[in-house]
Amino acid sequence: MNEPQGRIENGVVRVGGDARQRYYDSRGYGRPLDGNEIALAPVEAAHLLYRGDLRIEDMDFPSFVQGVEDPSFFVRYLVYADLRERGFYLSPAREGWVPDPPAEAQFVVYERGSGPWDDDRLYDLRVAGERESLSLTTLHGALAVVDEESEVTYFEVDRPEIEGSSAGFSKPTEADLLADRAIVWNPPHELFSAAFYGQPLSGREDGDGPIQLSLLEAAYLADRGVLSTDGSILERGREVEGDRFERRLAVYAAFRERGVVPKTGFKFGADFRVYADVESIDDLGHSEYLVRVLPPDCARSPREIALDVRLAHGVRKRMVFALASANDGTEPTWISVGRLTP
């Protein structure tokens, strides 16, 4: 056998001979040491062992994998091997392998045709098993989830800019509270037809008749001094939903302040669907996002994330998680997640 032999030392596999040319320069494995020697991270060494491109004394692929104490190692290996098979070069996100290793990521994936020698990054990659719990605020770049059958599903994660050009509404208006909604008996024409607040009592075609407002819509208008009612909308909202109402109200207000119209997402299984550029009720445009409102410290399982992303994708939208506190005045954190095909 002509394959170089490595030795395990301080948690890495060191390989000499022509290792730099053979592994790093030509295929993006490892990191250079002195001369032609390189260090391989365990996941890189495992992949080369499996392919028969490396020898380690008295060890084969099964014994090497079983000897790694990190319980998440094999999940990371499956993702590493999958991306290698797809033609990508990637490096472990650790000191010595990449400059400024990204927090919460396990790999740095490079653009096709690029590798660790030029640091042309495609994305930072977080790896998780399907039974893990993930803090949404720690997600960025891309996420790879390995399910119980060892299949890998990829998601892209970003922080969207929420902005639109929809019309506002400022005419003083009166409403009556009725259980968990409000009714504007004599609404200004612009309330529904231009600003897209509420629903006409007798159907969408009758924009000048009585308008039903959700408690969120009514609370937002009341807070801005536009709507007056015969009772406290906030108190009613808290009675109906507790802290969840105030979190949803914070997100609703943030959308409206950015020129975006949020409407109920109930029929899609979400909190909101949103419209960025409403010119009139007859020209709504496409609803780009489905929005789920969650507490700032919320953790989700990969299964829950996958369900939400699949739900949004099925109706040609993208899922946004809005992380908001209940009535503390802080801005929501927006996290968008979608399917990714490497």
Language-model segment annotations:
Residues 1-342:
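Long Lys/Arg-rich low-complexity intrinsically disordered regions in nucleic-acid-associated proteins
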